[in-house]
Amino acid sequence: MITIKFLIALLLLPCLVLAEEDQPLPGHSHVGDAFDEGPRQSASLLGGTGKVTIPITSSWPKAQAYFDQGLGQLHGFWYFEAERSFREIAAHDPNCAMAYWGMAMANWENAKRAKDFTAKATALKDKATNRERLYIDAHSNYFDNDPKDAKKRHQEHINDYENIIHEFPEDLEARAILVCRIWQFSRKGLPIHSYEAVNAILDQIHAKDPMHPAHHFRIHLWDKRKGSRALKSAAQNGPSAPSIAHMWHMPGHIYSKLHRYQDSAWHQQASARIDHRWMLASRVLPDQIHNYAHNNEWLVRNWIHIGRTQDALAMAKTLIANPRHPKLNKITKRSSSAGYGCARLIDVLTKFELWDQALALVETTYLQEEDLSLAHQRDRLQLIGTAHFEKGNNGGLSEAIVSFDALIIKAQELHQESAIKAVEKATTEKKSKKDREKAVKAAGMKTSSLIKSLEQAKSGLEAYLAILNNDLPKAREKFGDIKRDKYALALIRLRLGDNEEALKLSEEATTKKATGQVLPLAARIEVLHGSGKTEEARAAFEELRKISSSTDLSTPPFTRLIPIAAALDLPADWKLPATVHDDIGHRPELDTLGPIAWTPPNAPDFTLPDGDSEPIKLDSFLKRPTILILYLGHACLHCADQLQAFAEHHKQLEAAGFNVLCVSTDTVAELQKSQQAYAKDGENMPFTLLADPECKIFRQYNSYDDFEDQPLHGTFLIDTNGKVLWQDISADPFDDPVFLKKEALRLLPLHITS
């Protein structure tokens, strides 16, 4: 019997050209491994990235403009696009040392790539000016790991930038980078000894250029210390580099710190829209953008604070609906779109008491149990139990309690596995008995904490059950294990008749930290009114009115206030207009910035010949969702692994409703030889193969390295409306059809369009 592997081998045997040992694999960079990652499509001058410059040496006339753009993108932490700008320079002038310095800067948190780029810059620095050499040397000194002590190395790096300022007093960018590094190093053990001194450096920059994007760094400087010191920068940060989403995000730090959640949410929404607009234009995936998921999850939190229920719910679901990827966006990574989305969706459903929606959504792709980490499964099960409690459903609550036992067993097994692995690792490394014990203890800390949290969550649900069964002694005994916000606990205490405890909890929930948040105040009003404290309830209601301009009054926490408002002679629509601050600067209309959610881009249509020279149109495949594979022809051996993997799962993909279409860099003649190889053995080709020797389709799908003029591996999921729901473009082919099938089945119902 002929195996699929043999068939794929036959496919690739015709005209097979063995690469020389020192040649990179097809799809890999010819310049170096560091270039296999990052952007590989050409840059363009965008505008709106900040008015900044460091004079550089280059033979390419446009190099300075692209360098300045990349520098502005660095200041805005738009690292992926900054690297693209610097790569554009290197593509036109490979001898431009500062292009590689820029690439290293764009990979500041990726030491391996940063070192490789710094080495290239260092090798070319003799062609650079003295100022450029100082910038390059600062990086070279930092990444040589000498001294080994991180604190000393951080201080030396700061000294190197101060030296640039000494040599070139007019250089604003050295000052900006210096401030950025001082702030970054303060988070890694090198404290800031004088915030005023650092702020004075920023004052020097803004005295020369009031709209320099170093406003970003002033926000970071004062964010954790005294937010009001950065209010002016908060107003100017977005306009200083309006094309960079993160520059609109950053003011949200200050406004949130000052409890101005309306202003914070405006900025986070602006950031989300600009990111989504860029995704449509550049075809990058959401989680390829630095800070994207964090911005949007924080937006959900701020919308919760001001009571925008439906907006918060929609954004949480949007995060979950973003495409997942093994390297970029995994449900097990809590800081990804998937991880944040799951956590925030549970938050919204719980805080706004949307119990019917909660019980419906836990059975959908939004909160599928099999996809979740144990921590997320804990939160999901806790949501289910809480919903049943609030609906008075003893049976459903009891089932949730029993379900926790299975999670606890899984966590205990994980704990044992981590201990065994720690022992094996310590033994392999020939560590002492004492060090082995330390390793086991360290390995078990995370799982021990997880087990404890699972047991506590179960106990909290048991407290709920005791309440429903009117077993008040047991309810009060276990009450401390209920994991809810204090204001929600206050309402439960009120329900139990523990008015004094309810008053205490509701007061604690409305301390200064909760200023500007509608939910704690709404609960406080309920508790005060239910405890006969009418005038205090009236005063609290007046405070709520001032911050509720955008609150959705149709959700349970606010519908319960209807009779209280009537008793206090307040109007049915008791909200007051929002306070408009006079320190917010210029704000564009949000709708002009881009869509509020990630929008799948259009799949470029095409017509290409198959091995029989018959024209095949992509559109003819789109009666079903289609997996499109762009592979690098008969000479690509690791393409064989990919095609083999998908061929082995071809029947499963077909049964699940998917077409598979492959586009090759081969000519029609080469495809014909592949078909003939199959025909000799009486087999049918498992896929339709099309020829694109000029790589036109590769370019249209961004599956092409513009800088090195070569095709890249690309795998895409296209729905029946011609939208690209998922993609992988890389130096290496994507060879996990099991993941892609599962992700495709998850994505398709989440992105149904008319």
Regions of interest found by a model, annotated:
Residues 550-607, 619-622:
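N-proximal helix/coil linker or "cap" segments that precede and/or mark the start of modular domains
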Residues 179-183, 188, 195, 213-225, ...:
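Alpha-helical adaptor scaffolds
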Residues 106, 140, 181, 185, ...:
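TPR/TPR-like alpha-solenoid repeats
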Residues 67, 98-102, 133, 176-177, ...:
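Alpha-solenoid helical repeat scaffolds
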